């Protein structure tokens, strides 16, 4: 059992180190093969001549007005539908 845990821990550490090393290689520019600093990319052009801009995703804030609770068969029987949604 100890050997099994040790092997799983080793595999997990290998996966984490590979993930960290590949995330460091990703940059916003084009890297040279000789490990020179990244050259920033120019924005791509759309056919009508306008520059393509990157839009950041917007998060929606949802306010919960009623407390959430678990559905019981009694709640469903009284209301006739599921009140949890």
From Swiss-Prot:
Disulfide pairings: 71-84
Keyword Disulfide bond: yes
Top-level taxon of the source organism: Eukaryota
Tissue-by-tissue expression: Highly expressed in the venom apparatus, and weakly expressed in residual body.
Keyword field: Disulfide bond, Secreted, Signal, Toxin
Subcellular location: Secreted
N-terminal signal peptide: 1-23
Summary of the function given for this chain in its UniProt record: Endoparasitoid venom toxin that exhibits insecticidal activity against Tenebrio molitor pupae. Impacts genes related to immune response, environmental information processing, metabolism, and response to external stimuli in T.molitor, suggesting its involvement in the intricate parasitoid wasp-host interaction.
Name of the protein described by the UniProt record: Insecticidal toxin Vn1
